[in-house]
Amino acid sequence: MKVSAFTFIKNGQILGYPFLQSIKSILPIVDEFVINCGESEDDTLSMIRSINDKKIRIIESQWNDVMRDRGYVYGQQKMIAQYNCTGDWAFYIEGDEVYHEDDLEKIKESMELYLNDANVEALV
């Protein structure tokens, strides 16, 4: 079983998001983490690079300001990251979410349990 995680982030430092903790919280159970990083006005990109984990794959993108209306740009940027995932499971995590270490084994067990179940499309 191969597990991908994915997210998108822009100006995470300015916005005060715990994006580094977010990324690190799920890294132990994934095989790759795709991060779509928009052109930030802060050190978001260099902070992500400082994690220095071989599982992390960074995609740099430009956000289309025309799509900001009603948050369309967020959906677009999320999908850019998701489409670059190569795992059997694609685990979406936002820059302000952090998973507790005690839950990681339960999450992994559920993914293993339902990996080949055609009736299960997602875990929530």
Feature annotation, model-predicted:
Residues 102-124:
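Conserved donor-nucleotide/metal-binding helix-loop-beta segment in metal-dependent transferases, i.e.
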Residues 7, 12-32:
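Short, well-formed alpha-helical segments that are part of the catalytic scaffolds
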Residues 3-6, 10, 17-18, 43-92:
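Active-site-proximal specificity loops/subdomain of glycosyltransferases
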